[in-house]
């Protein structure tokens, strides 16, 4: 991906790798959930094995894990995050949405909430 690429440009390029099943909204949504689960599972397994822990909202690695291994794990997490991004944008495409429109709409919603002091709370329409 080139520097300065827009969300829509990424979406267009990434979706060139789609198979016909990418048009299926249910399939894309369920795979998105699956990809998020894969990332969570990798981190959970590192925690279970004592190789990682979360402290003060940061993912930390145990002393016995060498620097090279830490870098490998971080790269694996990043690859999974990339799969999540691809799947999310695939879902957008199946829905007929442009990624930039989704992002701008979300920022507008957040700015409106902030202007009314409603960032914290429950529900989309607060």
What do these predicted ranges mean?
Residues 1-126:
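Flexible "arm" and connector segments at domain edges
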């Amino acid at each position: 991906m080139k520097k300065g690429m827009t969300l829509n440009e990424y979406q267009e390029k990434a979706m060139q790798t789609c198979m016909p099943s990418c048009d299926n909204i249910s399939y894309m949504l369920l795979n998105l959930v699956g990809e998020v689960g894969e990332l969570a599972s990798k981190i959970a397994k590192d925690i279970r094995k004592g190789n990682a822990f979360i402290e003060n909202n940061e993912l930390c690695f145990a002393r016995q894990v060498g620097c090279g291994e830490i870098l490998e794990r971080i790269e694996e997490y990043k690859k999974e995050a990339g799969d999540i991004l691809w799947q999310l944008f695939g879902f957008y495409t199946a829905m007929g949405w442009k990624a930039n429109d989704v992002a701008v709409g979300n920022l507008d919603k957040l700015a409106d909430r902030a202007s009314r002091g409603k960032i914290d709370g429950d529900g989309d329409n607060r």
